[in-house]
Amino acid sequence: MAKNRFLLIIAAVFVVLPAALSLITFYTDWLFFRETGYTQVFTTALAAKVGAGLASGLFMFAFAMVNLYFANRASLPHTPRGVFFEGGNVYRLQRDEMVQMVKPLSILAALVLSLLAGRWGALQWQNLLLFTNGVTVGTSDPIMGKDLGFYLFSLPLLEHVKGFVAFTVLVTGIMVGAVYFFRGGIILSDRGADVDGAVRRHLAILLGIFSLTLATGFYLDAVRLLLAGGNSFHGAGYVDVNARLPLYRILTLATPLAGAVVAFGLWKGAWRLTLIPPIIVAAVYGIGIVGYPAMLQKFKVAPNELALETPYIANSIRFTRLGYDLDKIKTVPFDVELNLSAADIAKNDATIRNIRLWDHGPLLKTYSQLQQIRTYYKFFDVDNDRYLVNGQYTQVMLSPRELSYNDLPSRNWINERLIFTHGNGLAVGPVSRISREGLPEFFIKDIPAVSLADIRVTRPEIYYGELSNDYVIVGTKVPEFSYPTATGNINTTYGGKGGVALDSMLRKALFAARFKTEKILLSSDITDQSRILYYRTVGERVKTVAPFIRFDGDPYLVVADNGTLKWIIDGYTHSSRLPYSKPLRGGINYMRNSVKAVVDAYDGTLDFYISDPDDVMIKVYARIFPGLFKPLSAMSADLRGHIRYPHQFLQVQAAMFATYHMTDPKVFYNRENLWEIPVLGEAPMEPYYTVMKLPGEAREEYILLLPFTPSKRDNLAAWLTARCDGENYGKLLAYTFPRDRLIYGPKQIDARINQDSHISQQLTLWSQRGSQVIRGSMLVIPIEQSLLYVQPLFLAAADKAGLPELRRVIVAYGDEVVMEESLELALQRIFGGKRAPVAGVAAAPEDGKASTGDLAREAMSIFERATNLQRQGDWAGYGEELRKLQQVLKQLAR
C-alpha cells in the first residue's frame, strides 16, 4: 500500500504537475492571443502542431504495434530466454510467463516512443504549414531544374519525414528483435545465431522498408549537393555534378534493389546472400562518393579549376545575390573631386547640420546622468531617427526612460507588480548640437516631458519596452506610481486596453500558478477590474505572435503625431535551403526584411506590416495567417515617415556584398576586387544613419551608409547606402571610387590624426590632467563629389562617474586635418567663409565668404579667449587660440 502511494506521488510530481502547468500556460497564452486579436494565428499554429504531433505519434504507435503484435503472436519452437533478477539468481520462465512479461513491456516502450515521436513531430508545425501552403517561385535551380519553392517550402519537411520514418523502422526493428530474442525465436550460441523462419521473414520485411528510407536519403543527399560548401564558392561544383550526383542517383535506384536481395536472402535463410548487397552498396558509396571525386578533383579539376568551375561559380554568385537581395543594388561610379568650397558647404547645410557628432556610448552615459531623474529609471539604448523640427528635416537621437526593477529602492511584490508598473517618457535631441559645456541639447527632456521643439508627447507612459521583462497588474486598489516631483509623487491609473482581465477566482488562480506566486490569488488589492499585463518586452511580444519571423534585436521608439509612443521593430523572413547561396554563421542563406511590427508602448497593441511584398516567403506566411499581416500602405502616414532600413540587415548585406559585388566568375575566382568593411581599433565600422543629398538628387534624405575598403588595404573602394524615405525606401546604391587613385579610408585618416603634432599634443595634455579622452566614431560624409571625414572627441573624468563632454571635433578633407571646438569652426578653418551655425539659425553669405566685420569680431573674440586662457595658465589652450587667430588674420589679409 505504501509502495503504491509512493508511486502515485512520483507520478503526480513528474507527470500530472508538469502536464497541468503546460495546460495553464496554454490557456493563458490563448488569453494573450485573444487580447491582441490574433486568435487565428494561435488556432492555425495549434492545429498544425496537433496535426503533425498526432500524425507522427500515431504512425509510430501503429507501425510499432502492428509489428509487435505479429512478434508476440508468432509460433516459435524454442524455449524462452532466461531472465536475470536481483541477487544474481536466474529464473527460467515458461513460455506463457515470458510472453506475459515481454508483451506489456514492448507495448509500454511503443507508447513512450510514440509520445516522444508526437512531440518531435509537433515541433515541425512550421515546416508542415510551409509545405502545404508553398508556392512556385518561378525560378529553377540550374542543376536539378527544380523550382526554388521546392527547396524553400518542401525540402525541410521531406528531410524530417525521411529521418522520422527511418528512425521509426529502426527502433521498431530493435524492439521486434528484442521480443523475438526473449521469446526464444533468436538463439545465440558459440556456433552463431539460430533464427526461426518466422523471425527471418518478419525482419526481412522491415529491412526492405528500411532500404526505401535509405534510398530516399540518397535522393535528398543529391538535392543537398546544391547546398554544400566548397573552397572558393558555395554550392555544387564540377566534381559534385559530374561525379557525386550520378552516383547518388545510382544509389537511389540500387539501394531498394539491394534491400530486396537482402530481404530475400533473409527470408530464405541464405545468409551469404544477405552480406553481398550491403558490401556492394558500401563499396559504391565509398568509391563513388568519396574516392573517385577526390581523384577527379586532384587530377582534373585542380589543374583546370577556373575553366571547369566557371559555370558553377556563376551559379553561386547569382543565387547568393538573390538570397540576400544584392541583385537589386545599383552600382554608380563616384569620381571624387577635391574642389569643395565654402559655397558648397553652405549649399549642403542640411547635410552638415545632421552630421552625427554624438556617439551612442557617450550619449547614453550622458543621458543617464542628466535625465535619469531617479535611480529606478534607466536609459537602455540610444536610437537614431528623423523628425521635422521647426520646419527642418532633422536627425535626432532618442532614448526611452524605462523602469529598472533591479534598481528599485525597496524590492517587494507590491512595488514590483502593482505600484512601479511603467517607465516614463524619453530624451530626444539633435545629433550635432552641443552646449557651451559640451553637453547635448534636448528637444524633449525631463518628467513630465518638456518639449522644446514641435515634437509633443501626450502619452509618456511606457508599459511595454525593452526592459519590461515581467508581468504587472493594473487597475488595482493600489495607485500606480507615475513620476516624482519636488513636492511628492504623482500617481496614475492605467486607462489602456492592454492586458487580460482578472475577473474571476479561476483566472487569478491560473495566473498565480503560471507566475508561481500565490499573491495574485490572495491579494486584496486585486479586484475584478484589474488587468494583468504580460509578454511586455517588445521582442518577446512580437516573437510570441509570429515565432516564424526572426526579429531585429534593436527596436526603436517613435513619437507619433498624436503624441503617443510606438515601438517599431524589423522582422526578417529567412531560410537555410536556397541552392548555391552562401550561408551566414548559423546556416541562413536567404533573408528579407519583409516585416515592420509596431507595438504601442502604452496598451501593447500589435500590428504587423509587409514591407517587402515581393518576398516569396512573406507571401506564403500571409496565406497561412490571412489576418496577421497588413500592407505597408495601411500604416499611418506619420509612422511610415519613421520606418528606416534596418542597421543589422545592411550589415549582413554588406558582409556578402564585399565579395559578391564581383559578378564576373573570373574576377570572383581570383579575388581581384575583394572588399572589406573598414576596421578601426579592433571592431569593424558599423552602418550609420545620416541625412544627406545623394548625388543627382534634388533634396536631402535619411539614409544608412557604410564604406568599403579593398581587401588588406586601407583606402576607400566604395560606399553602400540604403535609402529610407518615402517611395525610395529600400533602394540600395553602391557608389564605387576610381581604382587608379588613392581615396583616403577611415584607418588612413585615423593615422593622420595620430600623426598630427598639435592634435596628439592636446590629447596627451588632456590625459596627463586626468581626463579620459574618448574618440568617437569616424564618419565618412559624401558631399557633392567630395568626402568629409568627421570624428568627435569626448572628455570625461577618469572615474566611472565621469560625464562625457563633447569638447572637440576633428574634420579631415583632402590633405588637411583640423581640430576645433565645433564642427562649424573646423569647416571654417578648412574652407574659409563664415557659414551658418550648425543649428541652422542664420544663413551663410551667398558668395561663401565672411565679411571683414565678421572676421574682425571673430578675431576679437578669439583674442579675448586666448587672454583668459593665458591668465589661467592653460598654455595649450592659449596656443590653440593663437592658431585660430592666425587663420582669421590670414582671411582678413585676403
Swiss-Prot record:
The chain crosses the membrane at residues 6-26, 50-70, 98-118, 162-182, 203-223, 250-270, 275-295. InterPro entries: UPF0182 (IPR005372). It is found in: Cell membrane. The keyword Signal does not apply. It comes from the Bacteria. One of its GO terms (cellular component) is plasma membrane. It is a multi-pass membrane protein. It holds the Pfam family UPF0182. Keywords: Cell membrane, Membrane, Transmembrane, Transmembrane helix. Belongs to the UPF0182 family. This is UPF0182 protein GSU2333. The lineage of its organism: Bacteria, Pseudomonadati, Thermodesulfobacteriota, Desulfuromonadia, Geobacterales.
